[in-house]
A protein has these predicted regions:
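Short hydrophobic beta-strand element within catalytic cores of glycosyltransferases
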Residues: 348-351
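N-terminal subdomain of nucleotide-sugar transferases
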Residues: 1-58, 67-70
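Conserved donor-binding/catalytic core segment of Leloir-type glycosyltransferases
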Residues: 8, 226-245, 251-258, 266-267
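Conserved acidic donor-binding segment of nucleotide-sugar-dependent glycosyltransferases
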Residues: 363-364, 368-375, 384-389
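Nucleotide-activated donor-binding/catalytic signature segment of Leloir-type glycosyltransferases, i.e.
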Residues: 280-310
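Membrane-proximal helix-turn-helix segments that form the acceptor-binding/catalytic region
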Residues: 151-188
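Aromatic "clamp/platform" in nucleotide-sugar-dependent glycosyltransferases that forms part
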Residues: 331
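Short alpha-helical donor nucleotide-sugar binding micro-motif in glycosyltransferases
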Residues: 96, 310, 318-323
């Protein structure tokens, strides 16, 4: 065994500590990889190189960060994620020749550059993919529980971009083709749930699966939901800007909940689609947003729905803690980070029974599961939480216990490092 493991990570976005050094804004993503890279950077037995898209430049960027880690930011000639960019393979070949990794660890399969790295490295036994969402499977569920007219119609923005809901699903399927080829070409995959195990084995029966969870954002490991401090009869949903997240199902359930709790309030993280007024806002609006706004107005839910705007990590944490119940209404999820964050804080959860949710939630013990196309059952379970505070407290307590085991940072690091060592020994 070598004294030091040279590992190259391929990530979908620049991690925060690198973006700060490059003085670029890359949004709020990559938090757990920021934590993991910081841990690896401080270890004497790891030499780390991170590779990620650098969309702010036209040339290959190369810097050092932390104590001794390296970063390469690669440009793209083609920015549409459903089109394969051959030039990326050439750039990766150059990076690989310079860094000379023992192992390549690819985070996510959602973009074609995953396949580019698999092809460029061309060493299946020393390549491991860390699946997040599995886009080839997700594509099949993209339009779930939507009427056909909503799937096929266009807003002005959709027409110009050729990007209505049906076309979005087609693009997911195209991206899924690159994902499938990448998974077929590697020997090792990190997974988190029974669902992703089934999907990955269906793609590549010979693959070696290794279990490793993801760390959650740091602030979610502190603070605990308290029934007495929450806003009674309030619901929180962390995303709703595209069909997979099931906001249309949540709104249908909200109609029923309102019959029993007229003051119920649904908080939705993200931009406020109820106040689209300027010409610029109107021409940039998707048909799904227009559809959601129409449902809210038609079902007389305007006073019961509030869009929070984009939330920072701390504001998101506070929104969880203030809520009476957290809902995940997705038509498919692998291992929802939003559910994980709610679990760590102990916020009572009602989730659709889809994908990998049963690897996180045991119905009636540390959450409630409803049939994904049954908004009346979602409404029923929300009301169960509202009317039974002892049950809500019990669920919240069990969630924290489960989450502390699943998202233990030291255990996650141990699992990843052990897998690296096993890969080097074969």
């Amino acid at each position: 065994m070598k004294d030091k493991i040279r590992v190259l990570w391929l990530c979908n976005a620049i991690i925060p500590q690198v973006s700060e050094k490059l003085n670029v804004n890359t949004g709020t993503g990559g938090g757990w990889l920021n934590q993991l890279s910081d841990i690896f950077d401080k270890r004497d037995d790891i030499e780390l190189c991170i590779v990620a898209p650098f969309l702010q430049g036209d040339e290959l960027a190369h810097i050092t960060f932390g104590n001794k880690s390296e970063f390469y930011g690669f440009p793209k000639k083609i920015h549409e994620p459903w089109i394969y960019d051959d030039s990326v393979e050439e750039v990766f070949a150059k990076i690989l020749a310079e860094f000379k990794p023992d192992l390549v660890h690819i985070f996510g399969t959602e973009f074609p550059h995953t396949l580019s790295m698999v092809r460029a490295f061309n060493n299946p036994d020393k390549t491991i993919i860390h699946v997040q969402g599995i886009i080839s499977a997700i594509a099949k569920h993209y339009t779930a529980f939507l009427p056909e007219k909503a799937v096929k119609r266009y807003s002005f923005r959709d027409f110009i971009k050729r990007d209505n809901i049906e076309e979005q699903q087609d693009k997911f399927a195209l991206r899924g083709e690159y994902e499938i080829e990448a998974i077929k070409k590697v020997r090792h995959v990190f997974h988190r749930t029974e669902w992703d195990e089934a999907v990955i084995k269906g793609i590549n029966p010979a693959v070696c699966l290794h279990y490793a969870q993801e760390m959650m954002r740091g602030s979610f490991y502190s603070g605990t939901w308290n029934y007495e401090d929450c806003e009674k009869y309030s619901i929180f949903i962390s995303q709703g800007n595209y069909p997979l997240k099931g906001l249309h199902i949540m709104l249908e359930a909200l109609r029923s909940v309102k019959e029993l709790y007229s003051g119920v309030k649904l908080y939705i993280a993200g931009d406020d689609i109820l106040t689209v007024s300027s010409f610029k806002e109107k021409i940039r609006e998707s048909y799904y947003s227009k559809y959601i706004r129409r449902l809210i107005i038609e079902w007389d839910l305007t006073d019961n729905v509030e869009f929070t705007g984009p939330l920072s990590e701390e504001k998101m944490r506070q929104r969880y803690l203030k809520s009476n119940v957290f809902v995940s209404a997705s038509s498919i999820e692998n291992s929802s980070n939003s559910v994980a964050e709610a679990m760590l804080l102990g916020v009572p959860i009602v989730s659709s029974f889809v994908g990998g949710c049963t690897s996180l939630i045991e119905h009636g013990v540390n959450g409630l599961l409803y049939q994904a196309d049954a908004p009346y059952m979602l409404a029923y379970y929300i009301c169960e939480i509202f009317q039974n505070k002892d049950f809500a407290k019990s669920i919240g307590k069990k969630e924290v216990e489960k989450a502390r085991m699943l998202y233990d940072k030291e255990l996650i690091v141990e699992n990843i490092l052990q897998t690296y060592k096993e890969m080097l020994e074969t």
